[in-house]
UniProtKB/Swiss-Prot annotation:
InterPro entries named in the record: ADF-H, ADF-H/Gelsolin-like_dom_sf, ADF/Cofilin
Protein name from the UniProt record: Actin-depolymerizing factor
Expressed in which tissues: Preferentially in mature anther.
Homology family: Belongs to the actin-binding proteins ADF family.
PANTHER family referenced in this protein's UniProt entry, alphabetically: COFILIN-RELATED
One cellular-component annotation, GO: actin cytoskeleton
Keywords: Actin-binding
SUPFAM superfamilies: Actin depolymerizing proteins (SSF55753)
Function: Actin-depolymerizing protein. Severs actin filaments (F-actin) and binds to actin monomers.
GO biological process: actin filament depolymerization
Domain ADF-H: 1-126
Coiled coil: none
Originating organism: Brassica napus
Amino acid sequence: EDNCKLKFLELKKRIFRFIIFRIDGQQVVVEKLGNPQETYDDFTASLPADECRYAVFDFDFTTNENCQKSKIFFIAWSPDSSRVRMKMVYASSKDRFKRELDGIQVELQATDPSEMSFDIIKSRAL
């Protein structure tokens, strides 16, 4: 998980827009890194339709007072079509893994894309 922490620190420095993590055997590994130009749509398109993942996304937005801000989201992606055993593994490991990533501001759990739409992300950020 050291590499996960390292990449997360780089995301906080705005080197990456997002990171997708997967559980490989007993450990969490980095599966994909999104460059700063990538959008939220690029990010959601990178999540598999039928497998669980953890992800962090650095969300830039404008407040109602017209201030530019960003918030780091932790997303637990657990689609309905994924295997029950994997859902349980991801659910039981989530809090421990999330604690390793210092600086997460918003947590979101999603079982289908509508639960993590751009509008939902924006409303949770404000």
